[in-house]
Amino acid sequence: MNGVATKSALNLARSLYEAGIKNEGVLKALADTPREMFLDAALGHKAYENTALPIGQGQTISQPYIVARMTELLLENAPKRVLEIGTGSGYQAAILAKLVPELCTVERIKSLQIQARLRLKRLDLHNISFKYGDGWKGWANKGPFDSIMVTAAASTIPEALLTQLADKGVLVIPVGDESQQLLKVVRHGDTFSSEVVEMVRFVPLVNGELA
């Protein structure tokens, strides 16, 4: 299904529209991306359910609504270069790569990164740079970034990510431990504004690398 929407994917996109996702580019990207490719075969039948699913190593592929919502927020300033923290399965990266000119993505778990790279190559997505490393540190020599998305919950907003955000740039990040808030942070020169978008539930953003 490379670029061709299946009935299940179209139904998912339709349900996301009804749930409040209005960006047509985001909806099309989700409809055109085979979510089952990013899951273990045993979970393939759940690919188009609006739910988070396990991908191994204690990580998950996010609920499609959250993928779409975070992508909408990130696109508000029409970013050219985007940083994703937490490649995971590669599903969110696939959506972003269809919508922005340049995507840089960081993953701390080597086995997940290897699998994600293979999947994204099979989808013929070539505007992605990959880094194996600590997401808390971002990717300084690729910055500054017009937008940054974090796909795991940080206890606090990592200072390195604020530093790597361009002026007028947007950072979309879940913050908190037990109770987590999805924040949209905007840089204004040397200051930052933030707003709470909604309550969310993510795996934690962990320091360091894991082979």
Curated annotation (Swiss-Prot):
This is Protein-L-isoaspartate O-methyltransferase 1. GO terms for biological process: methylation; protein modification process; protein repair. Its EC number is 2.1.1.77. It comes from the Bacteria. PANTHER family: PROTEIN-L-ISOASPARTATE O-METHYLTRANSFERASE, PROTEIN-L-ISOASPARTATE(D-ASPARTATE) O-METHYLTRANSFERASE. The active site is at S62. Transmembrane segments: none annotated. Catalyzes the methyl esterification of L-isoaspartyl residues in peptides and proteins that result from spontaneous decomposition of normal L-aspartyl and L-asparaginyl residues. It plays a role in the repair and/or degradation of damaged proteins. NCBIfam families: pimt (TIGR00080), PRK00312.1 (NF001453). Gene3D superfamilies: Vaccinia Virus protein VP39. GO terms for molecular function: protein-L-isoaspartate (D-aspartate) O-methyltransferase activity. Keywords: Cytoplasm, Methyltransferase, S-adenosyl-L-methionine, Transferase. It comes from Shewanella sediminis (strain HAW-EB3). GO terms for cellular component: cytoplasm. It catalyses: [protein]-L-isoaspartate + S-adenosyl-L-methionine = [protein]-L-isoaspartate alpha-methyl ester + S-adenosyl-L-homocysteine. Belongs to the methyltransferase superfamily. L-isoaspartyl/D-aspartyl protein methyltransferase family. It is found in: Cytoplasm.
